[in-house]
A protein has these predicted regions:
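Conserved catalytic core of sirtuin-type NAD+-dependent deacylases
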Residues: 1-234
Length: 234
């Protein structure tokens, strides 16, 4: 979530983040979300309201621009844990949302997904099957995350011509260190690994990265851009 922090969105796991104000087991728990139906939807209605007020920041714009400018030379894949749409609004296209999208609703019964945008959910039933318990299209705790399969497949196919850029993560949910260590233990050589966080995280093994920039994402852009262009000789 650190990627979107500079846009003004609250993160979940920082000391003053959303989980310091709300119990995640009340608003992000697959085992009891129907029981807490009203509270859950109130929480995500508020998140959409906040999302409507912010704009992509410099790093969103840089990543989207890099994707556009290197099209045909570099395949850029944005694997994001963020549930906002700021990468999309910046113009990025090849995006995989590992934990769902705040601007969508899903029917657990029939699987129908509808775009709600930034408006509040009015508790209307599923327009396809009539189910009255429509859920935010967010991966809750204790819920399967189907996009993780793509994450592991992509990392399993990396080669020495590829680069991994990690921006704004604590490493506590998707343990990027474990993923990198796992694939490298199987003989996969990743050409360049860059980490950009505000500060070190006990869940991230710095020794796995070639370049580390502890700074705001927007401030790290010049260094990241230099490393990427040198690596791919752009």
């Amino acid at each position: 979530a650190g990627l979107s922090a500079e846009s003004g969105l609250e993160t979940f796991r920082d000391a003053d983040g959303l989980w310091a104000k709300y119990d995640p087991m009340d608003v992000c728990n697959y085992q009891n979300w129907e029981k807490n139906f009203d509270l859950v939807h109130h929480f995500y209605n508020e998140r959409r309201k906040e999302l409507a007020k912010v704009q992509p920041n410099a790093m969103h714009n840089y990543l989207a621009q890099f994707e556009r400018e290197t099209k045909g030379k570099v395949e850029v894949i944005h694997l994001t844990q963020n549930v906002d749409d700021l990468l999309e609004r910046a113009g990025a296209t090849n995006i995989i949302h590992l934990h769902g999208k705040l601007t969508e609703l899903v029917c657990p019964k029939c699987g129908n997904i509808e775009t709600i945008g930034y408006i509040a959910f009015d508790k209307s039933p599923c327009h396809k099957c009539g189910n009255t318990k429509v859920k935010p299209q967010i991966i809750f705790f204790y819920e399967q995350a189907p996009e993780y399969e793509k994450l592991h497949r992509i990392f399993g196919e990396l080669e020495k011509e590829d680069c991994v850029l990690v921006v704004g993560t604590s490493g506590r949910v998707v343990n990027i260190s474990s993923i990198i260590a796992f694939v490298e233990n199987f003989g996969i050589e990743i050409g360049l690994k860059i980490l950009n966080n505000l500060e070190p995280s006990e869940s991230i093994d710095e020794s796995l990265f070639d370049k580390i920039f502890y700074a705001k994402a927007s401030e790290a852009i010049p260094n990241i851009d230099k490393e990427l262009k040198a690596f791919w000789r752009l």
